[in-house]
Amino acid sequence: MLPINAKIFKAYDIRGIYGEDFDNELAFLLGQAFVALREQDSDYNPQVQLEIAVACDMRLSSPLLKDNLIRGLVTAGAKVIDLGMVATPTFYFAVGKNNYAGGIIVSASHNPKEWNGFKMVRRGGRPVSGETGIEFLKEKILENKFMPKKQVGQVVTLENTLDEEINFALSQVDLKKIKSLKIVADAANSMGATYLTKLFSHLPQCQLTPLNFNLDGTFPAHEADPLKEENLTQLKHSILNNRADLGIATDGDGDRIFFIDNQGETIPPAIIRGLLAKLFLQDKPGAKIGYDVRPGKITIDLIKEAGGIPVVTRVGHSLIKEQMLKENLFFAGESSGHFYLNTEYGCFEYPSIMILKLLVEFSEIQEPIGQYVNRYKKYYSSGEINREVDNKETVFEKIKKSFSDGEINTPDGVSVTYPNYWFNVRGSNTEEKVRLNLEAIDETTMKNKTAEILKIIED
């Protein structure tokens, strides 16, 4: 057995380099530790066998890790529902709709091909984070003192999960409102291809040009991270060459989604989030809508215009989902391309619903999508700028002192608001690094204030 690197236990998941930081034995131990975690939760009933869903992505190491994970769960007495190879949102949907006690998916999301990992959820798709269980799992796994169970579990296979997920998404919109649109989608040889293929098979009026839809864990075309501009080059060229109306890009496990307009320009996630907020507020007037602390004021503007209540959230899917459940937020989105909905099946990413909602919206406008979107580009953004620091807390105190005459909030790092610019400085979860995001009403202010804040951080 390869020694387990304790650094693989992150804030939101378990993730590292396969064959270097961990091997198949970790998956076996994780299966047993996860059962132990659920057995000490308040909703556990010892008279009822735990039903745990398991799935994996298309990485080369994923099937073997999944097999060992199942072996660990069964050894600990659980009934395993094997969902096979599915996207992370499909996995969440299966756990939520079928009311399983929890689930684990083998995936390293958008990380390079050498990586792999595990995302864990409880009932309803509630994420297991560092604060809510990953530390417990880490201790159990590194201790490795599991007692054999008198009765082992069993494995059943469930194959219709994707169909159920897509049918639910299709039920959320009037499909007749979606007109003939030319769309190019790049799945980066990753799991988004599964739901994109199924979804567009129900939309014959749309002409889909698929790029990199064959599942391949070596990522032959490019990395599966649409946040990096170089990974969108092929998609943007194809949009222009095909004179398409819209482009769609998904990440490695399919839980993040980006949209490109007909001019080959990335539509800022803050605008997508604002448009989706407006659309969901038509379904649920006056609802609370979440947006993360990274500046994206157009979202707040659109939420207020549509009669919603904007609510700021921390960054990170686990934290946002917990806040959505606790404060009854209907929809939320992140600058990173995660878009969440709070439904009867759980609170998690529903990319197929987001696509359908936007297709309806873009079908109703009387102008090219790029022209339509440009009206919402009111603010100038610095983008996310990372800096290594000696002490994150010291930086936060310097920021608060230097900008004490601004409106200061601290839900995640330090957020400061002035009439003509606003920014957030927050820390990395895993290293001594801070991230600056700033927005302003004009480009000069954006550049000057970004430089001023970076100087304070670096001094």
Please tell me what each predicted stretch does.
Residues 284-459:
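Phosphate-binding and adjacent anionic-ligand microenvironments
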Residues 135-167, 171, 262-335, 339-340:
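Proline/glycine-rich low-complexity loops and linkers
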Residues 116-242:
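Gly/Ser/Thr-enriched, mixed-charge loops and adjacent short helices
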Residues 40, 44-45, 51-116, 199-260:
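N-terminal small/polar loop signature for handling phosphorylated ligands or for N-terminal nucleophile
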Residues 1-71, 75-76, 155-182:
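An N-terminal, well-structured beta->alpha segment
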Residues 101-115, 239-261, 266, 310-350:
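Glycine-rich phosphate-binding loop
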Residues 127, 210-212, 265-284, 350-360:
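Gly/Ser/Thr-rich active-site loops/lids in small-molecule metabolic enzymes
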